[in-house]
Amino acid sequence: MAQVINTNSLSLLTQNNLNKSQSSLSSAIERLSSGLRINSAKDDAAGQAIANRFTSNIKGLTQASRNANDGISIAQTTEGALNEINNNLQRVRELSVQATNGTNSDSDLKSIQDEIQQRLEEIDRVSNQTQFNGVKVLSQDNQMKIQVGANDGETITIDLQKIDVKSLGLDGFNVNGPKEATVGDLKSSFKNVTGYDTYAAGADKYRVDINSGAVVTDDAAPDKVYVNAANGQLTTDDAENNTAVNLFKTTKSTAGTDEAKAIASAIKGGKEGDTFDYKGVSFTIDTKAGNDGNGTVSTTINGEKVTLTVADITAGAANVNDATLQSSKNVYTSVVNGQFTFDDKTKNESAKLSDLEANNAVKGESKITVNGAEYTANAAGDKVTLAGKTMFIDKTASGVSTLINEDAAAAKKSTANPLASIDSALSKVDAVRSSLGAIQNRFDSAITNLGNTVTNLNSARSRIEDADYATEVSNMSKAQILQQAGTSVLAQANQVPQNVLSLLR
């Protein structure tokens, strides 16, 4: 090797090696201080890219796990609200069962309906006000997508359904709706009800007042109707021209009449104070003249005492065929009803419903006036109409009865099959709750899987970018020794050119 001064190749070589050991020492210290094998892309370009992708996945999946927990919270919030809705529905069903019992009064039904209405309003309130982070979960149909992965499209959808009174089919639910009016209802629910029932007997038409029972003809100018005292037929004539049968007279009868023989036989066979019936009237034996049948009997007719005297039976003969009969008053028998009377002529009596029925009259429709309005009722009296529309009896808020037509009643009518309607609503709530319960379990599974994936990805990333302290400490020690040795050797290498000076001496 030539001895030169300008170029110290040994020094340059030593410096180069010293720089290398310096770089190794710097790298080892950086890794040991950061805990990472890859602190920049120069440390491991491919490894850095892989580790970075792992980091993205880990962070994304960690957030996805938190999202899934939010999904559970949403489902729990919604399911809790549905539980309260279910409780209210159960109470409504209980009240509906109570309402269907026939022993309830109008006030009972009103109280039941009032509580049902409050329960239904509470269902709507829960539906409108239940929310999670500002999102109303029961006020409308909605699909809420929960991101449960680190990439696009990795979602779980929560189906949120609108649950309120209307969607449950309970809008207008009523157990105390208007009742179809009957004639009996009109009479019992309103004051000063007037009107009449119509009847037809052949071609003849009649009206019967619903209050007094008076019978008149069904004409523009009605006439009062009577019963003919002689033949029982219906007539508009009230004349007194029907002769009654003169049964007991104030003049002595001829011997051996049926009446005289009957009374004499009763006296003969009885004793004073005994009673007996004759033609439906009770007589008392007042006096008895021996045992031949002569004597007196008495009775009360229309509040007046009548005495009958039996005489002319030969003493000891006891032949009632000889008996004569004399009355203290003239007594007649009505040809209409057979009753005893003091009038020799019977006046036609005012007709009654029973007289119409006796003449085979057939009932027709009725005209009922309530508060100035005239309503029509069918023959059975169980349907009342006005202008062709069926009428219903409704109650105001203060409990006062009022009449409304079928159009107004339609919006307030009692719910048909109320228990079936509530059961259907309960089934819908149960279906939504079941879906929410299933989605909670799915989120639990997703969270567990995300946790496992994050753990595995962290392990994989660690193997790529984390520093191996055993290796790096060894590398640092080696670099430190090389630094010390290199520094010492460099000092010696820098002294080599001075050997040339010895040649110049």
From Swiss-Prot:
**Superkingdom to which the source organism belongs:** Bacteria
GO molecular function annotations of the record: structural molecule activity
Q: Where in the cell is it found?
A: Secreted; Bacterial flagellum
Listed A to Z, the keywords are: Bacterial flagellum, Secreted
Main subcellular localisation: secreted
Q: Which family does it belong to?
A: Belongs to the bacterial flagellin family.
Protein purpose = Flagellin is the subunit protein which polymerizes to form the filaments of bacterial flagella.
Q: What is this protein called?
A: Flagellin
Species whose genome carries this gene: Salmonella senftenberg
Source organism phylogeny? Bacteria, Pseudomonadati, Pseudomonadota, Gammaproteobacteria, Enterobacterales
Gene it is expressed from:
fliC
